[in-house]
Design a protein with these regions (language model features):
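RNase H catalytic domain
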Residues: 37-41, 81-153, 163
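Intrinsically disordered, low-complexity regions
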Residues: 1-30, 58-61, 90, 132, ...
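RNase H-like nuclease fold core
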Residues: 22-74, 85-93
Length: 169
């Protein structure tokens, strides 16, 4: 007789291109995409994020936050922080993260050092949010595959406002 319960399902997706950040998958992961924009750089900025239900393009939430003055990289970090905080607040435990900033992706994963002092505190804040999750992996994607988060950040810069939109399941 098998020691494994017949209804036990092992949740484990291949991590093609993802950098492992924390833990093991305990459930199907949600997908978080983030972005940041500054116009000009530095100048009025916004960070934004969208969280999708596991294996779908159906959003759980989308959020952007206006920043009166920041660099593009600061705005990118703010997009990541916004997404992590909202996902944590929603009780999400398993997370795949995607963004189009190689710098932020690799710094967050720990593969690149943080050389700019203005990014160190944002990096620390983002990493501190990891305590809320069981599993996190992160991946760089091309800008065109990050269109939803990109649209949010551009909306934030244009509207000079901050918005949270929740969607029904």
């Amino acid at each position: 007789m098998s020691a494994i319960h017949p209804f036990f399902i092992k949740w484990s997706l291949p991590l093609d291109g993802y950098l492992h950040v924390k833990g093991k998958q305990t459930a199907p992961p949600h997908l978080l995409q983030f972005d940041g924009a500054s116009d000009p750089n530095p100048g009025p900025s916004a960070g934004g994020a969208v969280l999708f239900h596991p294996g779908t393009t159906d959003p759980v939430f989308e959020r952007y936050e206006f920043i009166p003055h920041a660099t593009n990289n600061e705005a990118e970090y703010n997009g990541l922080i916004i997404g992590l905080q909202e996902a944590a607040d929603a009780g999400i435990k398993n997370l795949l993260i995607e963004g189009d900033s190689n710098l932020i992706i690799n710094q967050f994963a720990g593969t690149w050092k943080i050389k700019a002092e203005n990014l160190a505190s944002l990096h620390k804040k983002a990493r501190a949010l990891l305590t809320h999750f069981d599993f996190v992996a992160i991946k760089h994607i091309p800008r065109e595959k990050n269109a939803h988060a990109d649209r949010l950040t551009n909306e934030g810069v244009a509207q000079k406002d901050s918005v949270l939109r929740l969607f029904e399941s």
